[in-house]
A protein has these predicted regions:
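Short, acidic/polar
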Residues: 33-48, 92-108, 149-159, 226-231
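Beta/alpha (TIM)-barrel catalytic core signal, keyed to glycine-rich beta->alpha loops juxtaposed to Asp/Glu
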Residues: 119-280
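Acidic (Asp/Glu)-rich catalytic clusters
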Residues: 12-18, 69-81, 100-110, 130-135, ...
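Short, well-ordered coil/turn segments that N-cap beta-strands
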Residues: 16-21, 52-55, 78-82, 109-113, ...
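Active-site groove signature of glycoside hydrolases
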Residues: 104-125
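Active-site mouth loops of central-metabolism enzymes
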Residues: 26-39, 85-94, 119, 145, ...
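Acidic-and-aromatic substrate-binding clefts and catalytic sites of carbohydrate-active enzymes
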Residues: 31-33, 59-67, 89-96, 118-125, ...
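N-terminal binding-site loop/beta-alpha segment at the start of enzyme catalytic domains
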Residues: 1-82
């Protein structure tokens, strides 16, 4: 891994430093209580923190992922070093409050770092609740999320019209670049942090480059693997705060984390990456 600390970006609403590579838990943390299933997840969490990463993003919609995240973070004594993000996905004020209270219990964290409104579900109701929770100190940051490109204009409209949103989470990758024009400029203008999900498009991008060598010129920005290239492309976008690849594989986590170190591609190199991808 390159010398020096992981690259960080400031959360615009506070200035708090956020390392650019985090961890998603969708599917991969939905496991049982047996040690065999949890051991690699423990290793992944250790690697994240030892490399300087902080963000762990989960959700009530990810099956047992919230509970597993809470268990493992507690067992490893990592709570002071991780930034726990979860979501609310329900309609109605009382159901929203109950779901968020349950998330705090499962995550073993009376104060959650970030709660996001998942897929904009009943977002006006949940946003009002989240604002109250933030005022009471039950959550440090609040946000909105979606995973489809079709939702980007609505995410942008909400950022433009609703004050006090700290984070927006969206799908963005070298293969799906709509956010570059539809959302990221608005997020930057409104000073909203951006979390990127699905940076590898659920693994589809690796199938496209299977058997193909990483270009030699990728060494110009300290990149040796396709995973690093995909992630460095994303985090080189100034509006992006953090990317959250999901993995239960310690080797993959180690590779992903390396993207957060060393040089990042400049605008000309990013254009070259786009041209390469579009030619495949």
């Amino acid at each position: 891994m390159a010398a020096g600390p992981m690259i960080t970006r400031p959360i615009p609403s506070s200035g708090e430093a956020m390392p650019v590579i985090g961890l998603g838990t969708s599917q991969v943390f939905d496991v049982g209580a047996d040690d065999g299933a949890r051991a690699p997840l423990k290793a992944v969490l250790r690697q994240l923190v030892e490399a300087g990463g902080r963000m762990v993003d989960t959700s009530p919609m990810y099956g047992r992922a919230e509970a597993v995240t809470g268990d493992l973070v507690a067992e490893l004594g990592l709570r002071p070093r991780v930034f726990l993000a979860t979501k609310v996905w329900t309609s109605g004020k009382e159901r929203g409050i109950a779901q968020m209270r349950r998330s705090a219990e499962l995550l073993r964290s009376p104060v959650i770092d970030l709660i996001q409104i998942y897929n904009l579900s009943d977002w006006r109701t949940q946003l009002a609740t989240l604002r109250q929770m933030k005022e009471r100190g039950q959550v440090r940051y609040i946000g909105i999320t979606h995973y489809t490109t079709a939702s980007l204009p609505e995410l942008a409209r909400i950022l433009e019209s609703e004050p006090g949103i700290d984070f927006v989470q969206c799908a963005y990758s070298l293969g799906t670049r709509a956010a570059e024009t539809a959302l990221l400029p608005i997020a930057a203008e409104r000073k909203v942090a951006v979390i990127v999900n699905r940076p590898f498009e659920d693994g589809d991008m690796f199938r496209r480059v299977r058997g193909k060598p990483v270009p030699e010129w990728a060494a110009e920005f300290d990149c040796t693997t396709w995973a690093q290239l995909f992630l460095k492309y994303i985090i080189a976008e100034p509006a992006v705060t953090c990317a959250i690849p999901a993995t239960a594989n310690p080797e993959h986590m180690a590779d992903d984390l390396k993207a957060g170190f060393g040089r990042l591609p400049d605008p000309q190199q990013r254009q070259r990456i786009r041209q390469l991808w579009d030619s495949l």
